[in-house]
Amino acid sequence: TDPPTLWLGHVGDSRCYRQRRGKLEQLTIDHSLVEEQLRAGQITLDQAAHSPMRNLITRAIGSQATVQPEIQSHRPQLNDVYMLASDGLTHEVTDEEIAEILTAIPKPQTVATLTKACEELITVANRNGGNDNITVLLVAVAPDASRA
């Protein structure tokens, strides 16, 4: 049988990350003016992080009559952890901090351990500034017992 496919639709600056075998990867690209400037080489990462325009979104639901989402497909693997998070979290918590927290989740992941990791991510975001709403969701890829 074909391996399962994870479909990801994205607009705006909320992000999806994947933690696979200890490596964190940002799967989405922010639809923001600052991200466009960064990709064009007009500003540095440090300038982007402190830009007063970092919340200027170029694509979002509700900003126009229609919006074209970015659609991606991924092949999830056992023990992958996917994180969906608002900019309130990703602007306050570094990728290194995210990776450290996600790597520390014991395997096999459970609802309790994923909930604890979400709480820890929110605590770190609040400790680091927490000036915006903070939303985070973790999804772990578990073995499919029906295929065992």
Where are these regions (language model features)?
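Short acidic, glycine/serine/threonine-rich loops at helix termini
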Residues: 4-5, 20-21, 39, 94-97, ...
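Conserved, helical-rich catalytic subdomain that frames metal- and/or nucleotide-binding sites
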Residues: 29-78, 147
